[in-house]
């Protein structure tokens, strides 16, 4: 399914049903009074959050959502049936905007949370409502009121506990395959990850959600590569996991690669750049065992990093169990 993280739709609530103009007509009653009933109310339109959804692609094909109208009233003071409300499901992490006023209507953060987007029209009044001591046979009624019509914008930011960072081919997809049941595409060329993806990591009957985005490259803030436009999907993450390939196949410098990511993060959003991070040094198995500690310490010194570090091999699983345990300990503490 195509990943879509923004959409615009037209929402039309239902119109209220018209009031009835009616008079009592029965045998032996020549001049019955008014008995026109009220109409029914128009249907509201709600958005509802669903945790099984992770894209707005549905709204590429359907852009109009219209609730039904209320039924008109009828004789014998019978009120028209009110219309059922329309509920439209959207992914968690979606912000709902009014495109005309730029008002933020609401934000989906919980499963089955509902947001009222457009109110249905109020019902029309039957002529019985207008009977009075001086007007015993009113012919006045009111039509149903129109429902609200709104142009709505949807902006999705995926909800995850952990956000993955790294240059293309740093090993993020391999890491996801190693510690979760997800099976992202892996290849020896950049940008095998083309859009944000979510995976669930389990440990001791607990679960956390990890988000991966396309790798970042230098000048991403100017539009280079694929990852920059997806950085917003890491904004909700509790912790960022920066994956560094210590022995890149393209011969690039891992120190420069790390600093490039940090620089592009700051250009995008200082608040995101200041999120708590863990450093994962990948492909540690390719280093001679006797030199591993020295090379890792040299890297940490060059990037001036003093936080928590995990040395792993995403290919064969070396160090991944310790990484998962550390992630759960950190996330569950927040």
Swiss-Prot record:
Positions with a binding annotation for GTP: 166-173, 191-195, 212-215, 282-285, 313-315
All copies of the OBG-type G domain together span 160-332
Provide the residue positions that the database annotates as binding Mg(2+). Answer: 173, 193
Cite the entry's keywords alphabetically: Cytoplasm, GTP-binding, Hydrolase, Magnesium, Metal-binding, Nucleotide-binding
Q: Which GO terms describe its biological process?
A: ribosome biogenesis
Give the E.C. number(s).
3.6.5.-
Q: Which GO terms describe its molecular function?
A: GTP binding; GTPase activity; magnesium ion binding
Q: Which family does it belong to?
A: Belongs to the TRAFAC class OBG-HflX-like GTPase superfamily. OBG GTPase family.
What is the protein name stated in its UniProt record?
GTPase Obg
């Amino acid at each position: 399914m195509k990943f879509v993280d923004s959409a615009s739709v037209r929402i039309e609530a239902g119109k209220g049903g018209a009031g009835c103009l009616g008079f009592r007509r029965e045998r032996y009653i020549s001049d019955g009074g008014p008995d026109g009933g009220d109409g029914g109310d128009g249907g509201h339109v709600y958005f509802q959050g669903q945790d099984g959804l992770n894209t707005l692609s549905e709204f590429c094909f359907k852009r109009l959502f219209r609730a039904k109208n209320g039924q008109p009233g009828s004789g014998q003071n019978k009120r028209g049936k009110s219309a059922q409300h329309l509920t439209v499901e959207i992914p968690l992490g979606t912000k709902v905007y009014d495109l005309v006023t730029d008002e933020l209507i609401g934000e989906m953060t919980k499963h089955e949370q509902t947001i009222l987007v457009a109110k249905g029209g109020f019902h029309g009044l039957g002529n019985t409502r207008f009977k009075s001591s001086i007007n015993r046979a009113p012919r006045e009624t009111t039509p149903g009121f129109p429902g609200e019509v709104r142009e709505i914008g949807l902006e999705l930011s995926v909800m995850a506990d952990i956000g993955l960072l790294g240059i293309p081919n740093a090993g993020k997809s391999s890491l996801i395959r190693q510690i979760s049941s997800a099976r992202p595409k892996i290849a020896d060329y950049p940008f095998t990850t083309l859009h944000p993806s979510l995976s669930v990591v389990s440990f001791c009957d607990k679960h956390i959600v990890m988000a991966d985005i396309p790798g970042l490259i230098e000048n991403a803030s100017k539009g280079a590569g694929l990852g920059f436009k997806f950085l917003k999907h890491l904004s909700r993450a509790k912790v960022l996991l920066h994956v560094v390939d210590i022995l890149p196949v393209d011969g690039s410098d891992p120190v420069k690669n790390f600093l490039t990511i940090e620089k592009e993060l700051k250009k995008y959003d200082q608040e995101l750049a200041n999120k708590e991070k863990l450093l994962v040094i990948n492909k540690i198995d390719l280093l001679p065992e006797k030199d591993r500690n020295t090379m890792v310490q040299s890297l940490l010194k060059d990037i001036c990093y003093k936080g928590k570090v995990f040395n792993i091999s995403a290919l064969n699983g070396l160090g991944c169990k310790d990484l998962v345990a550390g992630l759960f300990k950190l996330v569950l503490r927040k």
